[in-house]
Design a protein with these regions (language model features):
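Short, compositionally biased low-complexity segments
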Residues: 10, 188-189
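Catalytic metal-binding acidic patch
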Residues: 4-42, 51-58
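Short, charged amphipathic alpha-helical segments flanked by flexible coils
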Residues: 169-188
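Terminal low-complexity, intrinsically disordered regions
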Residues: 143-149, 165-168, 186-188
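A generic structural motif
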Residues: 24-28, 146, 162-164
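Conserved NTP/Mg2+-binding pocket subregion across the NTase superfamily
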Residues: 33, 38-148, 155
Length: 189
């Protein structure tokens, strides 16, 4: 399932990653994870600069949403070196729970795209407002410090969180910025 900027109309090959959620029925064995990761590393070479970001989750946690959400495997460019230097360790340890998945599932549920498999509404339940809000709140917790390193990213992210908090809007960062500009224009007039 494709989510993120690629489905929200604001993909930028120089700034965006490709966000994917892969849904499986059963637990994935480490040998299969290793084979899969070897393919992912090769595919990542053809991806945009920020690469691929993907998580493998079990269907059961999508239908009966669990928060924080368990995952079978996760990959992003941030973890590439770990996998390349110690693939067995990576495959054995890259499993757990991730609060960020609530945000990803929400984007999929409302705006995602099926690349292969069942219809979104057959696989994913709607994430509760509380879980989604906590997920996006966790994403901005360090904003006061992070804004010095990535001001545009943080400001746009803050705008989209506020758009959800105030109006229940599921927005991309770009849309969050546009929403905020509209709010500021309203206040100015």
């Amino acid at each position: 399932y494709l989510h993120g900027s690629a489905v929200m109309g604001c993909f930028n090959p120089k700034k965006s990653d490709i966000d994917l959620i892969l849904v499986v029925r059963d637990e994935v064995k480490d040998t299969v994870k290793r084979q899969f990761m070897d393919m992912v590393v090769e595919l990542n070479k053809q991806a945009p600069e920020k690469g691929l970001e993907l998580s493998i989750v079990r269907e059961a946690v999508c239908k009966s949403f669990v928060y924080p959400t368990p995952f079978e495997l996760h990959f992003s460019v941030a973890h590439l070196n770990w996998y390349q230097t110690n693939p067995e360790d990576y495959v054995a340890k890259m499993k757990g729970t991730d609060k960020d998945l609530a945000a990803h599932f929400t984007i999929i549920y409302h705006r995602g795209q099926v690349l292969y498999g069942k219809d979104i509404r057959e696989v994913f339940a709607e994430v509760s407002r509380e879980a989604y809000m906590d997920s996006i709140w966790c994403d901005i917790e360090g904003a006061a410090e992070d804004i010095l390193e990535s001001p545009m990213y943080i400001i746009l992210n803050l705008c989209r969180v506020l758009g959800y908090k105030e109006e229940g809007l599921i927005l991309s960062k770009k849309e969050g910025g546009e929403w905020m500009l509209g709010k500021l224009a309203e206040k100015a007039s």
